[in-house]
Amino acid sequence: MTDNLQNPPRETAVPVLRAGVFMLGAVASFTLMAVAGRQVSFELDTFEIMMFRSFVGLAVVMAFVLVQGRLHELPTRKTGTHLLRNIFHFTGQNLWFFAITMIPLAQVFALEFTTPLWVLILSPLMLGERMTRMRVIAAVLGFVGILIVARPTPETLNIGTAAAAACAIGFAGTYIFAKRLTRTESLACILFYMTVMQAVFGLICAGFDGDIALPSAQSLPWLVAIGICGLTAHFCITSALSLAPATLVSPIDFMRLPVIAIVGLLVYGEAVSIYVFVGAILIFGANYLNLWSETRKS
């Protein structure tokens, strides 16, 4: 009995350990994507970044589909839902790429952590889910955290902060429509339509002014990194959630904040305010409180 308590069964410990490794992969992918996005922003606007990123992603997805023999999974009857999901995601990702060029990377990541709170608020409207008392408490705590991170005064509030806060709403819409799609669609199908639709959106938006900039030889590796990291990050998160409960996975995802703060300091000389960490801890606490409440009910 004592040995079992001190040494958890291998079949329980190994999946949790694997989930942790996947989440470290997600942290690394998101961090590299932020650095790569800032590097190419000196040459390309956000629409061009999204267009080239989607082309890279489409090549990777098609290679995966062909190698795995999953072409039969691509036909869909949910084109409208795919379209809505990708409008939200394209908007949110554009705002995210814009924000990382305007404000410290750690501040962008802290505000992005409010995505689950927006899911909590929008789900009753889009999915018909019930707004419980615990969800209301979590939302209030989260938005107090937003105020601490953003400190909205005439001196501190700017378009970069607004973009970072708004991108979370776009990502929330993405998750809500993804939740609908996963009931009937495979991951390969969802990723295929994501890359195709966003490549089209990017091409239309980037070419609206009649001038699409081409990446230089120096920027091309960064664009490839953005395209690959965007896919690997979401693959790692999905894999981690399939191996361990969200209440265990979520705290590891929070490691993105100190990691990106260190990267921002070392690479770009960005000093991070203590308010970013205080607010982010409150945002994380609100997210975790909601996760814990939902897990306990289930």
What are these regions (language model features)?
Residues 3-4, 258-298:
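C-terminal-most transmembrane helix of multi-pass membrane proteins
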Residues 35-38, 46-47, 61, 154-215, ...:
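Transmembrane alpha-helical segments that form core, pore/gating elements
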Residues 27-35, 62, 86-94, 116-121, ...:
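Hydrophobic/small/kink-forming positions within alpha-helical transmembrane segments
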